[in-house]
């Protein structure tokens, strides 16, 4: 994740259209097709997400937490009360990040969606992914 401002702006654009700005008790977010990053789950945490699902067709997300240092530094400057480490202090495996902020990275494509309980997601979004799903895969 070498462009934290792009990740943030993309998340914010979708979030602002979701109607969840005033949700007091947190929300559950799902991004379909996060690509090579868990950034949207990290950013959702800043906006009060209690759970984030990141669903993709394969395990393409960068596995080293050190690669998220730029994102953490960006968010630490943007928000006053976030609990992110400084990029120079990051030595954790990415699983510690996903566990700490309740981010579930699911890599079985549409089969991952079938594992979710009905009505368990408040906010679902996708950035340039839906056009890659073939119609027969929806059935």
What are these regions (language model features)?
Residues 27, 50, 122:
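Conserved acidic residues
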Residues 10, 27, 38-42:
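Active-site and donor-binding regions of nucleotide-sugar-utilizing enzymes
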Residues 39-113:
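Class I SAM-dependent methyltransferase SAM/SAH-binding core
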Residues 24-36, 53-56:
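Conserved class I S-adenosyl-L-methionine
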Residues 111-124:
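A short acidic, Gly/Pro-enriched loop at the edge of an enzyme's catalytic core
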Residues 1-25:
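Class I SAM-dependent methyltransferase Rossmann-like catalytic core
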Residues 103, 126-129:
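A short beta-strand submotif of the Rossmann-like class I SAM-dependent methyltransferase core
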Residues 133-139:
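A short, conserved alpha-helix within the catalytic core of class I
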